[in-house]
Amino acid sequence: MSKQLIPGPVEGPLADNERLKRESDHLRGTIAQDLTDPLTGGFNGDNFQLIRFHGMYQQDDRDIRPERTAQKLEPLHNVMLRARLPGGIITPAQWQVIDKFAEDHSLYGSIRLTTRQTFQFHGVLKRDIKMMHQTLNSTGIDSIATAGDVNRNVLCTSNPVESELHQEAYEWAKKISEHLLPKTRAYVEIWLDGEKLGGDEEPILGSNYLPRKFKTTVVIPPHNDVDIHANDLNFVAISDHGKLVGFNVLVGGGLAMTHGDTSTYPRKASDFGFVPLSHVLEVAAAVVSTQRDWGNRVNRKNAKTKYTLERVGVEAFKAEVESRAGIQFGPVRPYEFTSRGDRFGWVEGIDGKHHLTLFIENGRLLDFPGKPLKTGMLEIAKVHQGDFRLTANQNLIIAGVPAGEKARIEALARQYGLLDDGVSEQRKQSMACVALPTCPLAMAEAERMLPAFVTDIEGLLAKHELANDAIIFRVTGCPNGCGRAMLAEVGLVGKAPGRYNLHLGGNLEGTRIPRLHLENITEPQILAELDALIGRWAKDRNAGECFGDFVIRAGIIAPVIDSARDFYAA
């Protein structure tokens, strides 16, 4: 018997986060008072959650937590800040400011590029938080709504080659970001000492904001570097003779799930149809407001847009969006994705400018022994005349380099280890979330285990004479999915220290969800299984067949067709 589809909200007692938001005075809470509380390095009560709407998460160093407990000290509370950077574009002048702050005022001294196409500071103590926001504001950056139950940092394809089309798409990413921002002045009042003026009405987000986090992208086919199926709302650029004419709209993607709860699952976004440029902002607001009103505020595990679509039906949700936006979606315009990895090295744009994409393993910019990456980026920022573009794959593009400056930029990149011809294709196609020691949700290592684990995979590929091939490999330390493992050919999801669930069967284009193959296994067990599977792939693959396609064709794993119904099928 099929489940009845009922448009509208979920009835029942609301989750406590709804009380928290309702009583927060439009996200102010008592954050300002907490900043001067000398008894704790953390935030009290509701403020622990409310700071997320201001772009921060309270964390601690889990490596030293037992030691501090033994000394009868509280955890070393600090915050991680995620900047709002629509489309990932940052100037060299801004970079120099964030470099200095990371060096002088963070516990780890690093800049972390993330899968949300922005940067994060890790390990900022409470005494430096207000100064951090003021420092960022002085250079035109904020962290409004990069976390919490709001629309978060808007991603855009990092593709400066088609410079005119990319510029148009980037401008739309900025417009969408601004249109969907919270209107409350809480951020300005608390962090920038702004005057309290009132006028906190939230016409799009509502007084209780959204039921859960909401993620938006703008993507230029054929390059799916933003992984649209990981996001709630996606605008796929449709061009005519190189000129942007509108977008196909896809709604309801998302990768997070909960171990042991089969009501949670990753889901691909659904095609709603085409909209011209004149209706983009209305459609964005209509999708957000429909999710605002119909999303599940009773059970946060089922609160994201993907679950709303499954509960009410795609057609009902789409019709409601059309009604609210005052439009009708046109037929889906043809488009195709052929890749999603970054194009490393130099490329020349149609404007004659040059762009150098750097591989930054796990997005971590730090001065490592023999590879002073952070210093290298600072030295480049001092002389670069264009801008920097952060990618959703945690890499960085030095964009807009004049021909006469190529040699100097490349020399600096090589001098500091930012450009290394010895990096394998496999390493370039691998990434992980931060996980331990800073993420409080991590169940297993991710960023810290990935480099050595990739070396082991490189060894397996070489053993089977596939050293020039690569598998899209991703690790996420918990099932929330920041590392986007649920769109990888081989995805590891942390289950416990040293143990992971092994998923297989994604594809190169990022349009297929991998299925659970083995559960709760150790790294040596994973490598043994991959050894056998890569051996079969080497022996039996069709010409050019990627690993994810092979394991499905060979019957090793069944494809996920409709994840709401078959993700957990045997």
From Swiss-Prot:
**Is Repeat found in the keyword set?**
no
User: What is the E.C. number?
Assistant: 1.8.1.2
Q: Which residues bind siroheme?
A: C482
The cofactors named for this UniProt entry are:
siroheme; [4Fe-4S] cluster
Give this protein's Gene Ontology molecular function annotations.
4 iron, 4 sulfur cluster binding; heme binding; metal ion binding; NADP binding; sulfite reductase (ferredoxin) activity; sulfite reductase (NADPH) activity
Q: What's the superkingdom here?
A: Bacteria
Class in the EC hierarchy, top level: oxidoreductase
Alphabetically sorted, this entry's keywords are: 4Fe-4S, Amino-acid biosynthesis, Cysteine biosynthesis, Heme, Iron, Iron-sulfur, Metal-binding, NADP, Oxidoreductase
Q: Which pathway does the record list?
A: Sulfur metabolism; hydrogen sulfide biosynthesis; hydrogen sulfide from sulfite (NADPH route): step 1/1
Instruction: Relate the protein's function as given in its record.
Output: Component of the sulfite reductase complex that catalyzes the 6-electron reduction of sulfite to sulfide. This is one of several activities required for the biosynthesis of L-cysteine from sulfate.
Name-wise, this protein is Sulfite reductase [NADPH] hemoprotein beta-component
